[in-house]
Amino acid sequence: MNDQLTEVYASIDALIDYALAHLDLDPRNADWTRNQIFALFRLDSYPGPKTTTSAASVSDVVQDIVGSRSQAPYGEKTPDPLLAAFRAAATTAGLFKPEEGPAYADTIMGILSANPADLDDRFLLVEHRDGGMAAMQWFYDYCVANNYVKRAQLDRNPRFDSHGLTVTINLAKPEFKNMKKAAAGNAVAGGYPKCTICHENEGFAGRDKRTLRTLPVTLGGESWFWQFSPYGYFDQHGICVNTDHTPMHVDRDTFGHLLDFVDRFPGYFLGCNAALPRIGGSVLAHDHYQGGGELLPMHKAATWAAFTLADYPDAVVEILDWPGTAVRVVSKSRQSIIDVSDIIREAWVGYDDAANGIASHDADGNRQSALSPSAIITERGYEMSLIFRNNAISDEYPEGIFHAHPEYWPVKQEPIGLIEAQGLFILPGRLVDQLGIVEEALAEGRDLPDEVSEFSLEWGELAETLAGNHDREAIRQAVHDELGSVCYRILGNTAVFKQKATTQTFLESLGFAAR
């Protein structure tokens, strides 16, 4: 056997060791699993485990990962160094071309991962013993360990707080300026699976989903499933998807679904995008919710004013001190939360207010108004945030009257969905290079470079803030503050009621009285 194959076998042994340590691979299945990997490359000269110096050295990488597990955030482990060693050895040995490496790495991690039924059984054991949140933490750690969740990528994304918001620059997410495909739900060529979030994606090689694992969830007596996002926007970001491929919608049942979920996983939030183009998510053809293990800024927003409804004395509706238009329904009663939320929803989707430029339907009778709800549990009981959205367009604002206005497009042009409406902004990766050019020009006292001329608004405001200060740290802080300010103003663009008093008038028209 040549030295090149020795390195390949050593790297496969290291991955088997990793799976035994972190992916619940049963030792009784180790040889069988190893042979499945060998079969991919017609390997038949295996000398046995760890019989060479190379095997031992690669295996040391496993021990490094195991040894550092307690220091890693969330106790995470990733197979990235082992997969890199395998890809390098395999390409050197001529088993595949370098560009084929990611697909083969995904295939191998799929082989090493537990099958969905076994994983669900293990999840239920943890949940029964330690509760729903401990089980979700276990499942998240597993999805990091099997390389479906790209935690290392998430940790590389720039992130900072500014103007009461959290601003991130996502280095992996593509920027979609044209959202027409949202209505089609990201349909897959060939028709299988029907869209990018259908349950049939679990293990599907055609979309590199070999490592995707989902968990069954029951909402309102219906079959749903949970999966974590591979490139999450925040901690333990995931989606809860209707097992049936049915269009997005928000109705009375939606509120009950969200409460069912947070009852089972009380440390998570779960919310729903407005089910309309331009103000919804990128997949409207398949009903789903978004949530995760991190409270977003709007969940912690202060109250501007509080109201009650005579028929529901155990519920309080709070107008939020927030740049967008949002209220929060608070009660220890599930029924009151659902009833009051639906009263507001039904009123809003049919609400017309010409004086404030609000039309519930367009000239062709298409609905334009929707609510985007988000549920959490706190010491006060259930809290259901309701974000008022409207997707009307005009000659002045063809992308949306209540969308980011054109002067802010250099920073953010994509629609503002549930996550950003709640104060966590996901900005495009191009900003890293573009703002780097801006910072360099400010530090050197030069004019705004032509290649970033679209940032003239931000440049002017930065120049005024810095007032001739060329210190690089001060410039970086000023850029962060400017991005936060722009994001805050974008949320103001999305506000359907520009004044809190107008939101109050709307609630009072429904019979709500100031508390």
From Swiss-Prot:
The gene is galT. NCBIfam families: PRK05270.2-1 (NF003632). It holds the Pfam family GalP_UDP_transf. HAMAP family: GalP_UDP_trans. It catalyses: alpha-D-galactose 1-phosphate + UDP-alpha-D-glucose = alpha-D-glucose 1-phosphate + UDP-alpha-D-galactose. Pathway: Carbohydrate metabolism; galactose metabolism. Belongs to the galactose-1-phosphate uridylyltransferase type 2 family. The keyword Transferase applies. Its EC number is 2.7.7.12. It is found in: Cytoplasm. InterPro entries: GalP_uridyl_Trfase_II, GalP_Utransf_N. This is Galactose-1-phosphate uridylyltransferase. One of its GO terms (cellular component) is cytoplasm. GO terms for molecular function: UDP-glucose:hexose-1-phosphate uridylyltransferase activity. Transfers the UMP unit from UDP-glucose (UDP-Glc) to Gal1P. Can also transfer the UMP unit to GlcNAc1P and GalNAc1P. Involved in the general galactose metabolism, and also involved in the lacto-N-biose I/galacto-N-biose (LNB/GNB) degradation pathway, which is important for host intestinal colonization by bifidobacteria. The lineage of its organism: Bacteria, Bacillati, Actinomycetota, Actinomycetes, Bifidobacteriales. GO terms for biological process: carbohydrate metabolic process; galactose metabolic process. Keywords: Carbohydrate metabolism, Cytoplasm, Galactose metabolism, Nucleotidyltransferase, Transferase. It comes from Bifidobacterium longum subsp. longum (strain ATCC 15707 / DSM 20219 / JCM 1217 / NCTC 11818 / E194b). Coiled coil: none annotated.
